[in-house]
Amino acid sequence: MYRAVTRQIEVLVEPEFLPERSSPEKQQFFWAYSITIVNGGPDSVQLKTRHWVITDGFGQQQEVRGEGVVGEQPVIGPGERYEYTSGVPLTTSSGFMTGSYQMVTEDGEAFDLAIPLFSLDSPDIRRTLN
């Protein structure tokens, strides 16, 4: 599990390689990642936008920006948590991701909530020549 804390708000990430959605012979590798955001602060916050930096095994980066997560812009109250799962494809068998969420407080103050750098690793895949 990967963890980052910003302003008493914790972001936990659990990546998982999905062999059933991957085709190594076609250079297609797929991971799911589960995110838990825990508001340990005194104020409610709303997740407005996301920004991801995805790096493949060759060091090539792709940036993804968008509104909310999985179609939602959740409000997370003090002591509450929000969880979701999404996925990412790569053309290499490993890589990593990091990023941030733009959060807004009840007073309208915007700040970036850090998403920890996490690794995308697939198990060793042995190739057989026939």
From Swiss-Prot:
Q: ApaG domain spans which residues?
A: 3-127
Q: Which PROSITE patterns match?
A: APAG
Q: Please report any disulfide bonds recorded for this protein chain, giving both cysteine positions.
A: none
Give a Pfam family name: DUF525
Instruction: Give the InterPro entries listed for this entry.
Output: ApaG_domain, ApaG_sf, Uncharacterised_ApaG
Q: Which residues lie in coiled coils?
A: none
Q: What is this protein called?
A: Protein ApaG
Gene name for this UniProt entry: apaG
